[in-house]
A protein has these predicted regions:
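Preference for long, amphipathic alpha-helical scaffolds in soluble/luminal domains
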Residues: 4-413
Length: 413
């Protein structure tokens, strides 16, 4: 009888004790709320100045072709233009949006409505239940897709890249909030099953790192090492723009990790090493996949056999080569790619951007700006300042170029 009682009560006691320990641990070690370690995003700057990749004059001519496009208004194109030219750019053309005007488009609902049209749905809405700032995402069936955000958190990532402080006012149709609330919403909604997480990681690295371990709105803990696992898990080509924004997210996260003290770091050494190994393997593949002319195609993950790809369009070659050169400019020092690989790619981009026809350039403005930014990074030059310097260097250059054209509304990165 006693043994029967013991068999019944002992497991119950063990269970109750375990639950008590768990509850004590949960109460004694609550999940920390998300906090922002700084008011301004991290500045992740270049360190190269290689005229062999692109000369000053060549850079001017490339940037001259990549000035902000005129009407019709397209959120994706304006976001890429802001990312390339920055919030302080001003052009000698009243029909061309300046940097401040482009920034206002993303920060002020009235300015957005004036440019996008009074019947256009707002870009942001504030959830009355939790205060989250909701961004209108791209939907293939929407008649307003050209004025939507094309990639999850791409606006936040661009605001971070262009140095927008967290206390910057964000004026919506539902009232005024700030960029901190936009970032807080993005981090609350961040989870490991997101279809696109690259811009979320870039935003996290610039605004939030080294914070780690907060709970998202689904009750899941968000850990930086799990974000790294997502970045390196998928095949190389997976994701927007041939998987190349995943590589951008990796170099930005590594650079953010370099800017904090060892005691502050939350990125595990093994996670950083996994990213380094991944990037090192990609650089090896790029060395094998680069064409004799200097470009890459979407087949680059195949290595040497990618050189056999004869079907790639000029637009795709510029997209891939520009994105590759862009993230390569920010890799950790001991992962720097072979110099001749970078020079050949840079010189090919210079020729390609100058020779591409106007219609192709306008239709692919978004990805082509990555080529311009990449070339600027390899010269450690601010794009707007490089263009201004080029005007005096090439006095007979046109100060206005291109004409307003009706563009397709297919989303392009």
């Amino acid at each position: 009888m006693l043994s029967r009682v013991l068999r019944t009560t002992i497991p119950l006691c063990i269970l109750l004790t375990g639950l008590g320990v768990y509850r004590f641990a949960a109460v004694g070690n609550p999940t920390p709320p998300l906090t922002f370690p700084r008011a301004h995003p991290l500045v992740i700057g270049p360190r190269f100045n290689l005229p062999t990749v692109v000369t000053d004059e060549q850079l001017f001519h490339v940037l001259e072709r990549l000035k902000p496009p005129r009407n019709p208004v397209n959120t994706n194109r304006l976001l890429h233009a802001l990312r390339l030219w920055g919030p302080h750019a001003k052009f000698d053309d009243s029909e061309m949006m300046s940097g401040p005007a482009m920034q206002r488009y993303f920060l002020d609902a009235a300015e957005f409505g004036r440019l996008a049209g009074v019947n256009t749905p707002p870009l942001y809405e504030i959830d009355t239940e939790n205060g989250n700032v909701l961004v209108r995402d791209w939907s293939p069936g929407s008649p307003h897709r050209t004025t939507s955000s094309y990639h999850l958190n791409d606006i936040l990532a661009t605001l971070a890249e262009t140095g927008t402080p967290l206390d910057t006012p964000l004026v919506t149709v539902d009232g005024t909030t700030d960029i901190k609330n936009l970032a807080l919403t993005a981090m609350r909604r961040l989870h490991l099953e997101q279809h696109e997480y690259e811009w979320s990681v870039i935003s996290y690295a610039r605004y939030v790192y080294p914070e780690s371990g907060w709970k998202n709105q689904y009750g899941e803990r968000v850990l930086v090492d799990e974000l790294v696992r997502e970045l390196i898990f998928a095949p190389p080509h997976y994701g927007a723009c041939n998987g190349l924004h995943r590589l951008e997210a990796m170099v930005v996260l590594c650079a953010a990790d370099d800017q904090v003290t060892p005691a502050q770091r939350t990125l595990a050494v093994r996670s950083r090493q996994k990213m380094r190994d991944y990037m090192g393997e990609v650089i090896r593949l790029l060395g094998a996949a680069q064409s004799d002319q200097g470009y890459w195609t979407r087949q680059w993950p195949r290595g040497k056999s990618a050189r056999e790809d004869k079907s790639a369009s000029l637009a795709d070659k510029i997209l891939v080569t520009g994105h590759q050169l862009e993230w390569l400019a920010l890799v950790p020092r001991d992962l720097e790619p072979p110099r001749n690989m970078v020079v050949n790619a840079g010189q090919w981009l210079v020729r390609a951007v100058q020779e591409v026809d106007n219609e192709t350039l306008l239709q692919n403005y978004g990805p082509f700006t990555h080529a311009g930014r990449a070339l600027c990074l390899w010269r450690s030059k601010d794009p707007y300042q490089a263009w201004r310097d080029g005007i005096s260097m090439v006095p007979d250059s046109p100060l206005q170029s291109g004409q307003s054209q009706s563009l397709p509304d297919t989303p392009r990165d």
